[in-house]
Amino acid sequence: MRQRKNVTKFIKRAYRDMGELKQYKRYTKTRLNIISNKVFLLKNELYPLQPKKKRGKRDQQLKTTYTKKKLKRILSLLFRIGGKIYRKKIKKKKINLKKQQEPFTQNLTLHRLFRKFYLNLKLKQFKLLYKKYKGNEKVIIQQLEKRVDMVLLRSGFVRSLYEARQIINHKHLLVNGKIASLPGYMINVGDIISFKEGSMKRKLLKRLKKGLISKKSRKRWTNRNFKFKRFQNYKRKRQKKKNKNKVRATGPNYLEISHSLLLISLIEEPKLTAIKYPFTLQPEKNIKFITLLKKYKRLR
C-alpha cells in the first residue's frame, strides 16, 4: 500500500493521505476511509472540502472539534494488520468480585453512603465538625448521633428522617419545655425530649398501639359479653403466641424511652458499638474514610 506522509494544510488541518482520493459532493474519503468507515470511523470524523464562512466565535470553536487522534489511531491499527481490515474477536474478561477494592475507592463509597444516610449532609457542616474536633472520627460520629432528628429516628417514634424533620420544622417538638425548630440542634446528657399536646401526639400514640396489638385482639378486650368462655380462653392463649413475635423498637442503650408518655432522654454519650447503619459500615473498624476531607478538598 502506498504511503504518503507529507503534512499539508488542508482547511488548516494536518492529515495523512493513503490511496486514491474520491469525492462525494462536499466530502472526501480515501480508499482507506471507505473500507474502514463501517468499523472505525464515525460521521463526525468526515471533513468538508469547502471551508465554512466565519460568522462568529461559535463557528471558530467548531474547527477545533475535528478529531485528529482518531485518524491516527486508525492508521496505526492498519499498519499493524498490513492493509487487511477485520474485526478481532472480543475476549470476555472475567471480573473477580471477591477481589478487594483499592482503599481509596472503598473509603470514597463509604463517605458517600455516610452522607446520604444523614440526608445529604452538607460538606460545610461536615468540615466544621472535622476542624472543631481536630479529625477525631469517634467524636464526629457521636456528635452526629446527638442531633434531634437522629435521636427521634433511633427512638422508633418516627419511620424516617424526612418525617422527623417535618415534625421539627412544624414546631411539634420540645426540648426541656422549649421549642426546637432546627433539626441540627445538639442534645446534651440529661435533656428531655417531648411532644406538644395536639393532633401530632395522638397520631404517634395510635401508631405505637398498632405495633403491639392487632385489630382482632382489640375487639376481644372491648366486647366483654362472651357466651362461650372456653372458646374465648383458647383464642387468648393462641393470640399470646402470635404477639410474642411482635417486637417494638426499644432504641439503643444510650437512650431512655417511655412509649406511653412519648418522652426521650439521653442518659450517656453514644458508643460506637451501639450505633448501627443499614449499609455495611462498622464504625469500630472503618472510620478512616473521614480523613479524605483533609487529603481531597474537591469531594462532592
Swiss-Prot record:
Keyword Signal: no
InterPro entries in the cross-refs: Ribosomal_uS4, S4_RNA-bd, S4_RNA-bd_sf
Compartment(s) of residence: Mitochondrion
SMART domains recorded: S4 (SM00363)
Assigned keywords, A-Z: Mitochondrion, Ribonucleoprotein, Ribosomal protein, RNA-binding, rRNA-binding
Record domain S4 RNA-binding: where: 146-209
Annotated GO CC locations: cytoplasm; mitochondrial small ribosomal subunit; small ribosomal subunit
Keyword Lipid biosynthesis among UniProt keywords: no
A biological process term (GO) from this entry: regulation of cell cycle
GO molecular function: rRNA binding; structural constituent of ribosome
Entries under SUPFAM superfamilies matching the protein: Alpha-L RNA-binding motif
Entry's family note: Belongs to the universal ribosomal protein uS4 family.
Protein's UniProt name: Small ribosomal subunit protein uS4m
Top-level taxonomy: Eukaryota, Amoebozoa, Evosea, Eumycetozoa, Dictyostelia
Gene: mrps4
